[in-house]
Each structure stands twice: as structure tokens, then as C-alpha cells.
Amino acid sequence: MSEKEIWEKVLEIAQEKLSAVSYSTFLKDTELYTIKDGEAIVLSSIPFNANWLNQQYAEIIQAILFDVVGYEVKPHFITTEELANYSNNETATPKEATKPSTETTEDNHVLGREQFNAHNTFDTFVIGPGNRFPHAASLAVAEAPAKAYNPLFIYGGVGLGKTHLMHAIGHHVLDNNPDAKVIYTSSEKFTNEFIKSIRDNEGEAFRERYRNIDVLLIDDIQFIQNKVQTQEEFFYTFNELHQNNKQIVISSDRPPKEIAQLEDRLRSRFEWGLIVDITPPDYETRMAILQKKIEEEKLDIPPEALNYIANQIQSNIRELEGALTRLLAYSQLLGKPITTELTAEALKDIIQAPKSKKITIQDIQKIVGQYYNVRIEDFSAKKRTKSIAYPRQIAMYLSRELTDFSLPKIGEEFGGRDHTTVIHAHEKISKDLKEDPIFKQEVENLEKEIRNV
């Protein structure tokens, strides 16, 4: 597979995972130069974008690359100006990405500090009302692994600092004990490695890797829902670590009780320790984050420009810092000083984009569930009583109307139901909307509430 083909697939997947603003601002115009010795060199024409991608999106792209090429590749974003320093007499346009030899991939799993973003420490984490408790719990776990809260389960929306806290835990543990064996991974990567171990008959090595450690940090655990074999493997891994007093830290975009198609025995174990949630930052925290960022980068940005960003970008920290990066790039490319007017001009696409925050099926289930007094877990259950079945059909209808998810994906979020069930629900609700004006108003009100989440 050529570099161009690989990167086209990576961008296609990334577009689904990232917000439209993040994708179009930072990733859209990048190009894969080469893959060599387990490293993917990716070109970006804007220096700010290259730095930002390395800091904030390297892990996401690494996971996507694993899915596309089938082996571990670390992305490294550089500018076209930096390419001359890197090329070192290489051919200008390599045709095929080469898979590293068995010797280099057999033991390419990192247990040390290299797996963590150097910036993501407790010192750089800005504390506010929405994250004070998760920060305190994470610090307690890092100070005394398996002594305070085990497992520690951190949940919250995208870009609120869950991964930052997990990296900070890893750094702190290694600061206190450089010999500690720490693994940071995502549930997707865990699943892919598990599948590979089955395919290559390396189950024992896989289990040894994940069970002979001191701390396991696993991100986005919600993605193991509906993966029966992966859940079973993780259940035994969890038990082994917990019984041996090893620390487990888990992150998710939702609490355990709201993860559909999760085995009850796993759900109960996730609830053994402490569950903490991170909420979006308030104005003061957003300003503090921006001020800390410009201090770290030694940037000169007027307070009124920061105030504009903090007032306009309220959803999450990643979008907040991304807006700052976009402003800096815009100012540099146009050769204009940063003012409030330039800030508004640079961020107009972000601020005016009506879908900058993607509606999720969980958003829909939550709103519909609250309205009809249905628990979120009942949307995935096999119950067929009208008091549950009809709200479930409404939620399926709204999921098809308000999201870009495929029919099978929607069915999966409703207890692994077949796509034909989703089609039937959509047809049924569409018919009822035409025949019942009161019901139509009801659904329209639900839709407005969901769009305002």
C-alpha cells in the first residue's frame, strides 16, 4: 500500500473521530511523507499545526495507523521546511510503506515515559470547579498506586482533560519509581492487540504484557462494548491486576452504567473503586488555560483577544487550545498583529459552525430517557413493554435524523439490534408524526433540546 493510500484511509477515519473544525484546521491538508523504522513522518505546511498535532493528536493518529497498516507506527508531524533536515539523502517520494522487521516489532511495546506526552503533567493541568475532584483523585492514585482508589474511573466529554490526567499519573508514578512498569493504552489498541495475539498464536505473550505490570491506564473503555471476547480477556486481566494490588485507571465518555452491551461483571468491577466525572470548564478556568498556554509558549497576545476566545469557545479544552493555535497561525500567515477583530475573523468558522459539537446517540438516549422516564440502560435491554419500546423507537428515529451514524452503528448502541429494527423504528415514528400533530410537537421539542445539549 502506498503512502498516499495509507494516508487517505487515515484521514477518512480521522474525519469521523474528530470535530469538523479540528479536522479541517489541522489535519485536512497534511501529507504522509514516509514510514520507516516504526515512525510515520507527516508533512504540515504550518509550523503551529505541526506542533499542535504532535501535542494533541499523535495518540489518536497512532491508533488509526495501527488499524490501517496492522502494526505499531508512531506519527511525527514536521513542516515542509524541516523535511530537508529529515530526508538525509532519502528518495523524495517513497512508493511503498515498509513494515518493520520482526526484530523491531516483536518488543516495540513501551513501558516507560516515552508513551506519555511530555506536556501532560500535573504541573501543567489547570484546575477549576469542573475538574478539581478528578485531579485530586488522580494525584492520590499517582502518589500511592493501588492504595487509594482502585480502579479509578474517570469519565467526561471529549477534550476535557481525561487523557491529560492519565498521562500525568504515568509521569508521577515514574517520577517516584523509575522502575515501575506502566502501560498506557486505549481500548481500541487493546482490542487490536488481542485480535493479533489470537491470529498469531501469541496469547501467552499478550497476557504476560498486560498482567505483569504495576499500573494499567486504559483510555476510552466504552469502545469494548459489544466485543464479547475482548471483554472476557479484559475481565481476567482486570482480576489479575486487582488481586495483585496493581493500579488500574480507566477513562470513558460516560459512566459504567451507561455503557451499553457491557457485561455486568465488568460493570460491577468498574464501580468497585472511585468514579469521577470531568465537566466543561467555566469562564475563569478557560481564561486560566489560555493564559498558561501563552506563558508556556512565550506568546504576546492581548487580554481582550483571550477574553474573546474564552467567551466564544466553551465546549472543551482541546477546542479552546485549538482556537488559540488557529489564531496564531492566521496572524502569522497574514502578517497581521493579533487584535479582537483579527481573532473574530480567524475563528468565524468555528464560532458560526452549527455542528461544532457533534450530537451523540448517548445525548439522544439521555434526553429521550429523561422525558419518558426510561433509564438509559433500558434502551439496550431486551424489554418490549410499550413504556420502553416506544421511547426506544423515538430515540432510534432521532439518532438517524440527527447523527451521521450508520444503521448498524445505531443498532449497536441500542443493545446490538439489527439495522432492520432501526429502519422499522424510523418508518413507524415517521408515520406517527404525520398522523398526530401533538406527538409531532413533542418530538420537535425533544429535537430542540438535543440540539442545545
From Swiss-Prot:
ATP binds at residues 159, 161-163. InterPro entries: AAA+_ATPase, Chromosome_initiator_DnaA, Chromosome_initiator_DnaA-like, Chromosome_initiator_DnaA_CS, DnaA_C, DnaA_dom, DnaA_N_dom, DnaA_N_sf. GO terms for molecular function: ATP binding; ATP hydrolysis activity; DNA replication origin binding; lipid binding. The keyword ATP-binding applies. It comes from the Bacteria. One of its GO terms (cellular component) is plasma membrane. CDD domains: AAA (cd00009), Bac_DnaA_C (cd06571). Gene3D superfamilies: 1.10.1750.10, 1.10.8.60, 3.30.300.180, P-loop containing nucleotide triphosphate hydrolases. One of its GO terms (biological process) is regulation of DNA replication. Residues 71-114 are annotated as: Domain II. Keywords: ATP-binding, Cytoplasm, DNA replication, DNA-binding, Lipid-binding, Nucleotide-binding. The keyword Glycoprotein does not apply. Residues 1-71 are annotated as: Domain I, interacts with DnaA modulators. It is found in: Cytoplasm. Residues 115-331 are annotated as: Domain III, AAA+ region. Domain I is involved in oligomerization and binding regulators, domain II is flexibile and of varying length in different bacteria, domain III forms the AAA+ region, while domain IV binds dsDNA. Belongs to the DnaA family. Oligomerizes as a right-handed, spiral filament on DNA at oriC. Plays an essential role in the initiation and regulation of chromosomal replication. ATP-DnaA binds to the origin of replication (oriC) to initiate formation of the DNA replication initiation complex once per cell cycle. Binds the DnaA box (a 9 base pair repeat at the origin) and separates the double-stranded (ds)DNA. Forms a right-handed helical filament on oriC DNA; dsDNA binds to the exterior of the filament while single-stranded (ss)DNA is stabiized in the filament's interior. This is Chromosomal replication initiator protein DnaA. The gene is dnaA.
